[in-house]
């Protein structure tokens, strides 16, 4: 893990904090520092860090660094260092233009995590409602309530939490292809349905964490067993992560739309309608299981979909199912559609865990 710390060289207290923190972090990750705009810009491009940790937010180059990192797909952590406390904030607002204040708010809201250095600072910041992903770590430079090693340990735990969030965004093509094959095996219960697997090993940690957060770990574990793959021991239920503000762990379809009532076509129609409302990978998997059943009447189902104005969406859904869970074309009740609206559906699925 590579972490770039960016701080203002003019603030001696922050500089002491960064020095103490980075000294404690060196055993856990690769740490780099930048204390001016030129160095921050150069290292951001050269290092391609996993995380950019910005200290303070009252200088424009700090905000610009955070925004540049975000555009590059690099996750950011912000330690406030008291710079948004009410007494500081009021003075700042009288000096700053409204546009700069809005820029500050927008930048802080997009940080993966905001670290406050005490209970009062955390309470005051939370009242602003700028970012719900707020943490509290005391500053060992100015208090005996903690020490340098504990401060570093708690900070690294936040870094790990950031890295373990929305792992789909960080997965490579091998990992996503392996996941699709695993899901196909998990759905069918027979490795003969999977034609081939990638030759190289996937990023198992990210893959398994993603499965946990999408509540598909049971399908993934079964598929791994069917394919005879070797994976690391990882209790993903205990791994912490950050989620979007509106995130709820996906529930099985029976808890959302009710149980199967004996009419397969009607049940599939209900599933497709639910997926149109909220596309979730878990529900795509459950739909695929139903499409492989013998009692699906393709012609009747197509008529029912047309009556409910779901024919176009269902066609796009078939295309996405062929990619996400390798649904065979012979089991699609209608032809797949691949257009701009299909791409929108892909993005909704991809961005489910996006901060």
What label would you give each PLM region?
Residues 161-355:
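Conserved NTP-donor binding/palm subdomain of two-metal-ion nucleotidyltransferases/polymerases, i.e.
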Residues 109-133:
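A short, active-site helix/loop in glycosyltransferases that binds the activated sugar's phosphate group
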Residues 137, 141-142, 147-169:
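C-terminal alpha-helical cap of glycosyltransferases
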Residues 1-37, 149-153:
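N-terminal subdomain of nucleotide-sugar transferases
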Residues 97-113:
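Membrane-proximal helix-turn-helix segments that form the acceptor-binding/catalytic region
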